[in-house]
């Protein structure tokens, strides 16, 4: 089983990553990343702010990040993606409390989609950046990052699935990032968990809760190591429960009553 998640805008490069007795891995697609960096380096803070719809302060920060980005990734300029990304999904995952065995498992069974890096293993080193997949960054391959990445992410996902031994792909990514995957080109059974919270008597997807629940589902996968879709239905973290009637063959719906 392989799960995919989105990255996070919020990063933490100040806190040291947990110390495990195995090496971090190298991101595989940095030659492509370098092409994007070269394009992004041409923008002024004002131009980058307009492109990304971010504040002047964030635009200046990311102009500096693009200028400082290096093709070589090492312990001095980089941090493992699993511990560098912060945000609602990663709060639910709570990577800092993983055991060594769980980190080794998640390295095989989880991938993060990325606008700059394409696809990351949890222990792949990454440098600070902001480049969301939905950014309309004109490049030699087209008008945006979906055109730039083309089939590359899908091909590497297929390789990851082949290496870990079955064809179940659990899509825990946002629509923005999953748009970079071409499911019709994957030899996979793609499962999409959906998390609904009750509000005013109705169940709906609430972004903050849904993101955190995606992270909790990753945590559930690495703690229980399921090998079938049926076993995924046992997910009950955060008081969610599986709703058989609302679910389909490939969409698993989990609900949670309104919190008192």
Curated annotation (Swiss-Prot):
Gene Ontology cellular component terms for the protein in this record: cytosol
Signal peptide coordinates = none
Q: Which Pfam families match?
A: H2O2_YaaD (PF03883)
This protein's source sits in the domain of life called Bacteria
Please give the biological process terms from Gene Ontology that the record holds: response to hydroperoxide
Q: Which family does it belong to?
A: Belongs to the UPF0246 family.
Q: Which PANTHER family match?
A: PEROXIDE STRESS RESISTANCE PROTEIN YAAA (PTHR30283:SF4), PEROXIDE STRESS RESPONSE PROTEIN YAAA (PTHR30283)
What protein is this chain from?
UPF0246 protein APP7_0648
* Record organism: Actinobacillus pleuropneumoniae serotype 7 (strain AP76)
């Amino acid at each position: 089983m392989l799960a995919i998640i989105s990255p996070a805008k919020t990063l933490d490069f100040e806190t040291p990553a947990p110390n495990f007795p195995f090496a971090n891995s190298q991101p595989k697609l940095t030659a492509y990343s370098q092409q994007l960096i070269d394009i992004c380096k041409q923008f002024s803070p004002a131009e980058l702010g307009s492109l990304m719809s971010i504040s002047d302060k964030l635009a200046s920060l990311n102009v500096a990040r693009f200028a400082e980005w290096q093709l070589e990734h090492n312990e001095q300029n980089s941090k493992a993606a699993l511990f560098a990304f912060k945000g609602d999904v990663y709060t639910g995952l709570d990577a800092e409390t993983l055991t060594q065995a769980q980190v080794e498992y998640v390295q095989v069974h989880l991938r993060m989609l990325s606008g700059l890096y394409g696809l990351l293993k949890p222990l792949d080193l990454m440098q600070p950046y902001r480049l969301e997949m939905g950014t309309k960054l004109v490049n030699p391959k087209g008008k945006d990052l979906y055109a730039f990445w083309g089939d590359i992410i899908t091909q590497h996902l297929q390789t990851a699935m082949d290496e870990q031994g079955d064809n179940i792909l659990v899509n825990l990514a946002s629509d923005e990032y999953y748009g970079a995957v071409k499911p019709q080109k994957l030899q996979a059974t793609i499962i999409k968990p959906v998390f609904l919270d009750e509000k005013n008597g109705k169940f709906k997807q609430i972004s903050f809760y849904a993101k955190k629940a995606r992270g909790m589902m990753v945590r559930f996968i690495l703690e229980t190591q399921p090998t079938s879709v049926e076993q995924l239905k046992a997910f009950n973290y955060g008081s969610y429960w599986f709703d058989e009637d609302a679910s389909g063959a490939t969409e698993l719906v989990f609900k949670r009553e309104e919190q008192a």
